[in-house]
Design a protein with these regions (language model features):
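NTP-dependent nucleotidyl-transfer catalytic core
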Residues: 1-178
Length: 178
């Protein structure tokens, strides 16, 4: 899937020294400086395109855009991936409610989102992946999890069983019950 038009980044004056960037590390429960690396990988969850984007979306993408720009300004390579959930219950429900084809609704909202990102001058991801185009990978992963006994069913929907993952909660510090 195509993302949006790239944004020109003017060169940073070589005399400018960037301060160290610290980020919250949920696993260690504190702010820690980013390690110095040549390559950083960023993944950001994208929208479910059933309605117009809003300030909450903008806040997320602007936050990651700042981190992306900071890393590039430090001379690092950044591999930035973002998904888009272009098939999901809220999208299907909105399409049914409005009497429109869900694919057309998704496409129209994706175009609006792209326009918003261009207007906000957000750097586009290197890879912009829709769920529809990744469906074979998704169904294969679900099949593997089901074969391992790592899923359970409620009303014909499959859910991941957090009890199947001994490390569940190790980064978030959440108990299985939470």
């Amino acid at each position: 899937m195509k993302s949006w038009a790239t944004v020109a980044i003017p060169p940073l004056d070589k005399r400018f020294v960037l301060p160290e960037l610290s980020l919250w590390d949920t696993a260690r429960a504190g702010n820690f400086p980013l390690p110095n690396k040549n390559l950083y990988r960023i993944y950001v969850c994208g929208i479910t395109p059933y309605d117009a984007t809003h300030l909450g979306h903008a806040a997320t993408y602007l936050t990651f855009d700042l981190a992306h720009r900071y890393l590039r300004a430090r001379g690092a390579q950044v591999r930035f991936v973002q998904n888009i959930t272009d098939i999901d219950d809220p999208l299907l429900e909105r399409a049914t409610r409005d009497g429109v084809d869900w694919k057309e609704l998704a496409q129209s909202q994706i175009e609006l989102f792209r326009g918003d990102m261009v207007n906000l001058h957000v750097l586009p991801p290197d890879h912009y992946i829709g769920v529809v185009e990744a469906m074979d990978l998704v169904t294969s992963a679900i099949s593997t999890l089901s074969e391992r006994g790592s899923t359970y069913s409620v009303d014909n929907d499959l859910y991941f069983s957090v009890h199947a993952d001994k490390k569940f909660g190790s980064r978030s510090h959440l108990a299985h019950e939470e």
